[in-house]
Structure formats: C-alpha cells, structure tokens
Amino acid sequence: MRTSSAADERRLLIGVVIHGPEVVDTGFALQAIEWLEGHGDVVAVLGGTMGRVAVIDAGLADRIDISRRRSPSQSVQDLQHSDLTVLLNHAKSRETGLVFGAIVAARARPMNPLIQADSGGRFVAALANSSGISNVIADGLASDFGFDVLDACMPDDNLRQEGDAIVRRMSGVLPGERISVNGTVIGTATDTCVEIVARDGRIVGARGIDLKMHGLEKLPHVDLRYAILRSGSVRRTAGMLKPRLGSIRKSGNGRFAIIDHAAEDSFEIASDASFVITIGDDTTAIAGDVLSRLGIPVLGIVDGDLDGICSGLVLPEGSVIVRVRAGNDDKIGKAIKSISENRRPSSLDEALDMVRDVAGDRIVSVIRSDGR
C-alpha cells in the first residue's frame, strides 16, 4: 500500500488580498475566506485605508491583517510564497473590475498563480500564472458563488503617451461623481469618459472633469501611471454592523497631527496623536470616519454644507467642526499650520481657540460632535 509523503499531506497555502470596503461590507470577503479555508490554509491581508474601517466594523481584524497600509499589488507581491493568491474585490461594474484586476497583475508581476474573484462584477478571472490547482480553485469559486469565469483584459488600454504628457483614462465613471487622485479630490466628473493628463509629475489638464484647482494645489508630485484613481464615494456600501468606535483617547501627551490632504493615510499620520486638525471638507469627512475607529477626536475646518459633509458620517466623540466662509478653509488651515510650528496646542480646545483667533468673523458656525 502506498504511504502518504509529507508533500502529499501538505495543505495548500492560499494568500488572499482584500481590496476596498465594499467586498467586506457585502459579506463576500468572509464568505470567500471561509470557502477557501475548506481548500487550504489562508493568509488574508488588506489593501487600502477605508477597507480597514470596514474590517474593524465587521469584527474581522483577527482574520484579516490590517496592520500595514499596502496597495493591492504590493500585497500580491508579499504573498508570492503562497501556492496561489486570490484577489477579492467588489467593483462598480464588470468592466471596472476587469480593468482593476489587470492593473494589479501588471504592477505585481507575481511568480505564483493569481486569480480574481469580484462580487460586484460577479466573475472570476485568472490574472497570472494559471496552474491546475489555481484553475480548480477558480472554477470552484465561480460554481459555488454563481459567478462567470472570464478572461482577464489587457492592462495598458487605459494609459497612453501624448507628446511629453501622460494620459490615463478612468473606467466606470458616472457624471457627478467626485474624482480623487491618491486620496485628494481634484474635481467632479461631467462625463462618463474621463481622462487625466499629467506632465513632469503634475496634473495639467483633464477631460470630462470639472477640476477643483485648490485640490490640485494640494497634490504633491504624482506618477500618474501608478497613482490611485477613484470615482465616487470612498465607501459605496453600508457596513454590516454598527461602526465600532474606539474609546476616546485621554492621553495627555499633547501630540497632534495636521491632515490637509491624503486623508486615507490617517491611520499612519495620527497613530499616536491625542487629536487631529483636518483642513477641507473632503479631508475632514474621510479622516473623521477613519479616526473614529481609533478614538482620536478631530478639529475639522470646512467651508461646505455641513449636511453634505456629515450625512451618514461617523465622527469621533469630542470632535469639533468649524465651518468658515466659502474659500477660507485652506487659508485658515495654512495659517494654523504656520502658527503651530512655534505655538503647539496641547489640547483640542486650545487648538480651537487658535482657529477662532485666526478665523475671526470668517467663522459661520461651530458644531461639537457626540460621536454619532
């Protein structure tokens, strides 16, 4: 009788990369992980910041590693030691899902098999290095979840060179959606056909976008080939559970952080802060939602409609939103940044006094949050 060798008995090691909050909010991430655990040992990691919020809300932080902020392609590279890697996503459409998968595969260039399971587009696709094992897993996922098996698309269709400029096309955009680059909102879509033009690391134009100039001014050097482009809300789905708010921090270390762009980096920027000053409507909305899970209060300086900013938004307990006259949030924020270099506020209330002194009669209203 043939005896089993160690190799025969070794279970598959399956890497899983979860992208974005929607695949968590809909429940598919957990369902897929549990399905894959029936076929091997699973190591699950996350890509992106708002996905972290969804994982915390769903109570899955013990099953999905959210300790580091890594892009999907970086996470795929990190898991190359596994027998295969599964990319879980929930795209707005089948088209955008296929484009996303192709971009991740092209950037990661993994050595092991990579497949994508997309609950938004309802498909499974082999992205790289197909093998007998990965084909079995892909077919099984498609069959058990009722998805179609599709061919991956070409990765470079959305990028081209025009003279000395780089042009990148976005897929699946709807008119009226906000367009962000690396977490900074640069404008609003006016068409379904959206293209962004960059030269020498700066965005110099766009097609199908009503550009927001002060959003562009906040952007540092941008490599458009690898930038994270997003249309619409940073979290299109409601969480499965009530947001899990962190206990309000009582630390007296007096450390604070200022976030005036790249709000999706809030976990890293504010990890040991007692409070955070956020500048701008979009930045305050995103950072406030993220920091509420850490229990870090926010002093937000905004100039927009508070109903629009706070609708469905969870702010940390003890936060304060200062609404100023239109066009003044960035100016006041810049002044606060300058002053705080020499006069560092030790508490949120002290920082609020600084804002009152700087803003004066430009303040429209001050609203305190109770964390809801």
Where do the PLM segments sit?
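Conserved mixed alpha/beta catalytic, RNA-binding, or beta-rich assembly cores of soluble enzyme
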Residues: 2-372
